[in-house]
Design a protein with these regions (language model features):
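Interfacial aromatic-anchored transmembrane helix boundaries in multi-pass membrane proteins
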Residues: 41-52, 80-111
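Hydrophobic transmembrane alpha-helices
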Residues: 2-73
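Short helix-perturbing small/polar motifs within transmembrane alpha-helices
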Residues: 2-17, 24, 38, 93-151
Length: 195
């Protein structure tokens, strides 16, 4: 007589084990932090500002979109914590609470909003054009959120006026952020494949 394994067999219980789910989540958070670290190394320094053009914001959009809000935000929080204690995880393999550290804090906001955008994408019942338009708007919002802590930190760290902080830390990056947001919208469908 041939019997089917029950859903409570040893193998079955491992695949649905809360402990295994926590290990998987931890692994995904670490992978997200690694992605933020490695992709964040891609920078173009600008001679007129301490803030470089960075692919870190694109990485935060991608990590949030693929891993979801919770795991994406935890990945960014871990990156920020490592940087704060001096680990070389920031652009140029630097660490510490440098003048651009506020943007790293902003990666948490980006990941939260991008993760939410992926959820909205997966539940959106409209046409593909409507889904893409909604996705782009949400990814633009996610990308823009980095400027709240980024500009505040830049202003405080440099002692600059608000107008100077905006000209150093926002204006040069608007076009690039729009492009990154549009491209990152293509990652939104990946979230439904990674639960």
């Amino acid at each position: 007589m041939v019997t089917k394994p029950s859903s409570t067999s040893a193998a079955g219980s491992l695949t649905h084990s809360p402990a295994l789910a926590h290990v998987r989540d931890a692994g995904l958070v670490l992978a997200g932090t690694l992605a933020l670290t490695l992709i964040g190394q891609i920078t173009i320094p600008l001679p007129f500002t301490p803030v470089p053009i960075s692919m870190g914001t694109f990485a935060a959009l991608g990590v949030g979109a693929v891993l979801g809000s919770r795991r994406g935000a935890l990945s960014a929080l871990l990156l920020g914590a490592l940087a704060a204690v001096g680990a070389p995880v920031l652009a140029g393999w630097s660490g510490g609470t440098v003048v651009t550290f506020g943007y790293v804090v902003g990666y948490v906001l980006i990941a939260l909003i991008a993760g939410r955008a992926a959820t909205v994408w997966s539940r959106h019942s409209g046409s593909m054009a409507s889904r893409v338009a909604t996705g782009v708007v949400l990814m633009l919002l996610a990308s823009a959120s980095v400027y709240v802590p980024g500009l505040i930190w830049l202003k405080v760290a440099t002692g600059a006026s608000w107008s100077t902080a905006l000209s150093l830390g926002l204006v040069p990056f608007i076009v690039g952020d729009i492009l990154k947001s549009v491209v990152a919208t293509g990652l939104l469908p990946a979230r439904s494949r990674l639960r």
